[in-house]
Amino acid sequence: HAKPYGFEVLVERNGQCSRYLCQNLVIGSGNVPYVPECLQKIQQDYPEKCRHSADYLTTPLSNLTGNVVVLGSGQSAAEVFMNLFDRQYDDDQRLISQFKLHWLTRANGFFPMEYSALGLEHFSPDYTHHFYHLDEAQKAAQLQQQALLYKGISAKTIRDIYTKLYQHSIAGAKQQTFLHSQSNLIHAEVLNQQIRLIFEHKVTTQQFYLDANVVVAATGYQTPRFDFMHHVHALIQTDAQGHWKITEDYRLKHKAAGEIYVQNQEMHSHGVGTPDLGLGAHRAAKIINQLLGYALY
């Protein structure tokens, strides 16, 4: 709640509600897992069959039979794929499981993340300053071209995956692994206790389907809805796309009395360095210095 002195914050923990009065707020809640819309109800109704990669390690997968599908082409997808690939074989690389492993992505390929010394200059305060002062159209265009600066797979992981696939191919092992790029998931439904996934190839527009016993969606993260801020939403300025307007020093532009700072919610305004942990420390220092009124860091 916005108040004349700043904000009133209500926090519920273990069934108990606490009330805090403050002059300023820092929102650092991060992002939440994103699951394609056609899979959301299936994930809710059949969590043992469909889950986001964020939950991959919390509950061991069972029923690894038939088709097992990994969606996505980032680092998380690659690591899930490697783990499932290894579970098909024993220590002597003999096939011990009969499930078929499918790795699909709508991206044009399974590409490495840009991690060269000069490429990393995009994750610097200087580049953040440059990006901030572009207009909205320029920012949107730049972000579309920079996906592999913060998405993609590490070169080592790609090499490890290729080595595993190569070693099994030259050994004449039965093919149990399939990789498909440019495959856009357009529909999913549960049929006969399996998840039918319908894809459309981005180039040929040909449709095909897979009936999966298990689906792991390594499909990234998205900005949460921030329902807890609904009392102050009307006071916050937004751009034409509905994004929060954020100053260069990470303050929301709003009409309330105090300041609201944000962490990891400014991709649209500050660029690809937003989720970077190194820049996160720099961003936190700038916020702390403003709260203190002097340069501690």
Residue ranges and their predicted role:
Residues 1-75, 79-297:
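Flavin (primarily FAD) cofactor-binding/catalytic cores of flavoenzymes
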